[in-house]
């Protein structure tokens, strides 16, 4: 039986954030793909769904809320952890209503991030 590493997709328009998350997650054995645009992520999900999506809310093309809505409309079941540096009242509740499993604030706490991803990976196993 071939073991595959869990695939984590990162959607963030900040290149430094994508690079830092990619480096961190790879050290923990995850396969990582990064996207700077929501449209790119949605196109990629049509061919391969990630085990977990780290989703920034504020994006230049399609915001995180719209990404969640489109994933749901396309019946693409992806476990999502929202990451944002722009917390607003009601955001956490809104993203959870759209299907996100967790909501984390930037700057990210490595322990909290890994716990959120670990919970998703364990549940899927």
Describe the residue ranges of each PLM region:
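Acidic catalytic/metal-coordinating carboxylates
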Residues: 36-37, 63-66
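The feature encodes the CheY-like receiver
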Residues: 18, 60, 88, 106
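Active-site beta3 strand of CheY-like receiver
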Residues: 48-54, 59
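Short amphipathic alpha-helix used as the core "switch/output" element in two-component signaling
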Residues: 43, 65-76
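C-terminal output helix
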Residues: 90, 108-117
